[in-house]
Amino acid sequence: MRCKMFAVLVASSLFLAGCTGDKEEDEDSSASYSEMPETFPQWDELTDDGTNWSSTRLDGQAYIVIFSAQWCNLPCMDLMHTIWNTVPEIPVMVMSTDNGSEISFEDWHDSADAHDDDGDEPNNNLTSFRFLLGDEEGNVLGIESPGTTVFVNKTGDITWYGKSSAANDADLVMEQWDIANQD
């Protein structure tokens, strides 16, 4: 019985590896995905604030998509705040690849907002970030790790994608945001 419990514990810890630990760099932080399509898939989802957002609604605007999960805290939330601190108030869609989570999108957004708070003093509130389901979009794109970040340009084309360790760099965020906004 002890061996079975140990095996379950080890398997559980492997499932959460990379989403609860330190900010260590991934082995290959530049995207290692099979073949990423050139265009981001069409999507239409209900967000944490009860509004519908879609690729059609964002047509003509660049935006960023962070594929995450409600249980992914440290690296995913650090990434969210790096993006906010670099280019605040831009449209960022935080898409959950976990369709079975018991954590609501609203609670997830509140938790991400509070991630960088100093005690009772709130810092950033990620007001232009929308938290929504994105498991189908993640499957279409072959996303396998939380924190995968995709920059989408004004015409819906993917201009850059990578893991959270690569995207968690202010210079890269600014450079890729500028590229996504080129005409």
Regions found by a protein language model. Name each.
Residues 1-32:
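Secretory targeting signatures
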